[in-house]
């Protein structure tokens, strides 16, 4: 086992998330400073499919920066989709497409959720590109962490597991339990822990358990399967949003109300049911442990020192 040394996360110069993370005392390093350090950081790419790209960047970088490992992050977006909520200037400055990195290998990859879950996969306008990216991860990434719709897309493409519509939106903060205890990804997890969900579709436990290569790691009575993975750890599927900030569900609720969409307040979220109050962050410890375990045990401990090996 390699010795672990406290190291920062390396991010692009001038990325807006930098100032937020510095104020939160997250250990980060910009590119120009990182060049003076003679070590190999972990190469992590993030395929950011969320409409609120800058907020998602901050959420994920916060978690990756709270580990004792130096991480070099590349941000990716689909070239076949033009986001409405992110400027072209931001994308041009900080993002790459798969064509620009497909000859490279990465230690780890994160594929985010996306607001397209009610569409059939093949109706998503970047689905063909998405399948190419998922195929690419098999040969070019040591371990890939899929989140929410990203998890559903990965399960469908790699294993043929279909998502199923829910009668009502699964929306709130739910308790979860461990299904197994001798798996590195779950090291240090509480027996019961909380995480947010925000989705209109689900994947059934029975469908996952029919695939010999997969294992269910954590579940919720209300929310169903929460974490599943391939038995070799190369693919991890998280159905919820442990990366969310305390206010994220509140913003989603207020957005839907403003649009006139019938929507109940998030379950187990607002203090005493007061929708004007800022809820406490009940899942911070779980989220940090999930990402640090993935980064350490499934990426750092498994990746070759020379990525081309």
UniProtKB/Swiss-Prot annotation:
User: Which major enzyme category is it?
Assistant: transferase
Q: What EC number(s) has UniProt assigned to this enzyme?
A: 2.3.1.31
Transferase among keywords:
yes
The UniProt entry lists the main location of this chain as: cytoplasm
Record-level Gene Ontology MF annotations: homoserine O-acetyltransferase activity; homoserine O-succinyltransferase activity
Q: Does Amino-acid biosynthesis appear among the keywords? A: yes
Catalytic residues, per the record, are 148, 241, 243
* Site label Important for substrate specificity, positions: 198
State the name under which the record lists this protein.
Homoserine O-acetyltransferase
